Amino acid sequence: MKKLSIVIMMFAAMLFTAANVNAQEFQQDDLLGIWLNEDEDAHIEVYKEGELYFGKIIWLKFPIDDETGKPKLDKHNPDPELQKRPSLGIQLLVDFEWDGDNEWDEGDIYDPKSGKTYSCYIIMKEYDLLKIRGYIGISLIGKTTYWTRVKE
């Protein structure tokens, strides 16, 4: 029985050590920069205004609409006036706050493919990897996507 207790304590110590090795602390402005979305068809620049963080599309893999031959527009937006604006430059991330625990929250994310806006939080998993969760109501009902940092 004594040997089993020792083995359990050693295993617990190894798990604790592994968890601490993998845990990284990031700074609030580590979010700033240019990120590639999961579909790899857009670059989003994350920037800061005051204490809040925002993100806008600065590059599209396919910026021209195949049907019109003109720059793609925000055609899925529910606001008819906003349907006329170019996709390039659309603000996707709005009003994110740093919570001090590798997470930015209290913000919204706009999905130009559906024209819908969702509550959202962002977790920095690694310096070059973001987990972005958009949701309606509670975060259990939503979608997660991952963005990678664009190397400059």
Could you describe each region identified by the protein language model?
Residues 48, 98, 124-125, 149:
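Generic beta-strand structural signal
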Residues 32, 40, 47-110, 117-119:
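Central antiparallel beta-sheet cores of small beta-barrel/beta-sandwich binding domains
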Residues 7-17:
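Bacterial N-terminal signal peptides
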